[in-house]
Each structure stands twice: as C-alpha cells, then as structure tokens.
C-alpha cells in the first residue's frame, strides 16, 4: 500500500508565487489525512551526493529536485508532486497499487511534463 505522504521539493529560497499557492490549496481540499512534506535545504543534506552538491551550487533547482524526489520516494514511499500540480479528486482509490504515474491533462497542457510519482 502506498503511504499517505505527499512529498515536494522547494529549494533556492524563493517565495512561492500565487499560482503555486493556489495549486497546493487543492492538495488539502482533496487529500485529507495526507502528510505533506516539503524537502528543502533544512531537511535534506545537499552535500550528501556530488551531483546534488554541484547542481545546487550552479542553482540548477530542477536537477536538485530530480535527485531529491527519487531519493525520498525510494526511502520513505508516498507520492511526489511538483508544486504546480492541481488535484481534482482523492488519490485514495490508487493507494492499494504498488505504484502509479499521473500526467498532464491535454486540456491544461503548458508544454511541460507534470511529474507525479507514487511508490511503496
């Protein structure tokens, strides 16, 4: 069973804009009872891997996020989501699976790939 944990990464110290805040509000609305965990410089050791250390030093936030998301899903299980993901309904029916992947709806495509990973 997939744990009721939502992981996201926010590094670099920038403030979340209104779009991000609105997207994240939908998480609380539809994912009641889920633990939401923000991974950042305070709770992830940026120096733990040479790739992350170099990416962070170069301010390549997406690369830093790529590493952290894979690490936390492997170590803790749960759900990883980018901060610009809007949730429209509960994930509870999917939690009995070993894993699943979500993708961007064609009605809302921005040209970017939406990242949603789930694992046990």
Per-range role (PLM):
Residues 35, 46-63, 94:
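An acidic/histidine-cluster motif and surrounding catalytic segment
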């Amino acid at each position: 069973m997939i744990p009721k944990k939502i992981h996201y990464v926010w590094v670099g110290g920038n403030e979340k804009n209104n779009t991000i805040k609105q997207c994240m509000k939908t998480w609380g609305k539809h994912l009641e009872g889920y633990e939401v965990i923000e991974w950042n410089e305070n709770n992830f050791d940026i120096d733990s891997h040479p790739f992350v250390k170099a990416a962070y030093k170069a301010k390549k936030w997406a690369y830093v996020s790529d590493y952290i998301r894979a690490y936390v899903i492997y170590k803790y299980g749960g759900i990883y989501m980018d901060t610009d993901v809007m949730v429209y309904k509960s994930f509870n029916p999917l939690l009995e699976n070993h894993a699943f992947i979500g993708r961007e709806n064609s009605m809302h495509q921005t040209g970017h790939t939406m990242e949603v990973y789930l694992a046990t």
